[in-house]
Amino acid sequence: MNYISTRGASPALPFDRVMVSGLAPDGGLYMPETWPQLTADEVRAVATRTYPEAALQVLKRFSGEAIPLPDLYTAIIRAYGRFDAADVTPLRRMGDGLHLLELFHGPTFAFKDVALQLLGRLMDWGLTRENARALIVGATSGDTGSAAIEGLRGLDRVGVVIMHPHGRTSDIQRKQMTTVLDDNVRNIAVEGNFDDTQRILKDLLGDQELSQRLHLAAVNSINWARIAPQIVYYITTAAKLGAPDREVDFAVPTGNFGDIFAGYAAQKMGAFKGRLIVATNENDILARALATGRYAIGEVFETTSPSMDIQVSSNFERLMFEASGRDGALVSRLMGDLKSHKAFDLPPGMRARIAETFDAERVTKDEAADQMSETARDTGYILDPHTAIGLVAARRRQRPGVPMVALATAHPAKFPAAVAAATGSAPPVPPRLAALETLPERYDTLPAETHAIRAYIEAFAAR
């Protein structure tokens, strides 16, 4: 299995090389050269497998011959052994045909653990095999950073530098990162928003001289090895609900389009048919793009769902590549327009193909709060604000006779202020999160300028 760039002008790479890469040299994102396929019987069989067994069956199709199966399975077992749910991503029934997929049972209480606990182990395996080192750089709107740090802390062959927007995460999200004092980890509070951190990250990874000299790699969802493990829970969930013999719909709270693209990838593998619902907050570039065909960067609004306070959705480029018939030149031109003019128009054919699978719903913070209050009152179940957005979208788009799954992406204790404001009481706090209150923090505050971050990273690499 090789991987090609969405912009069509970079050499193909195997999985193990993509795993420790950032952007392709032409600025694009790596994608599978072809989509591996599951037969109907293989999908049905997933419903009876353990989660690690299902993960092996899916992920071996993406790693190909790059990772021996015993090594891949060992990494999977170790990664998901740290989750506090036996089935890793439990499915909870919320009503007639409506379900929540709980993705927050990992060590940092967010869905990012599903991918990053595994990615950390696979990176360590690959670097040890090659007797190599890597400097991981990441940008986080809240959850990616802590999950990446938890998966990579203490590794001898890996340095980690994570940028977060200063003052724009919850206190707990910040402390999950900044209280980690391992020598191989550094945190930067960037004086800007998440889109600024993501722009800087792409500048750094796009600098081929810097990337090669410092052996830079990414843990954001621009890295295909971040997307691949998330495909697994779409397949296991769809199989439990009757796929491929019935349709299953998913509503996904998303800002950067990575999680929902994993659902699309599962569909491309033949795992299930159904609608994919993009659930956005007031930062609604994806909802606007799907409704009007115009992808235009607007102002970033601060909301109670900070992990979705994003205007530039990096993984949308992957969908554009697929919906254009894998026309790398067209994707490159449109992304050039975005960089130059902060907007582009989806060609009619591309827009029509996207509409075959995707719908979108914009959910305000007040609507999310109402859903949190209603769910707590009626069921006793506590939602975090991101999950509430997904549940609102799911209820709006639920079809008769078709199972609808809303993704529960974070534990409510990560957002105590929003939960308390909506429900009247703070959520119970797991001991691991409560302990953060008394721990010292370490981070550096820098301007939202690539040159400043570059100098910091070079100094860290030279230590």
What do the predicted segments below correspond to?
Residues 1-463:
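PLP-dependent amino-acid enzyme catalytic core
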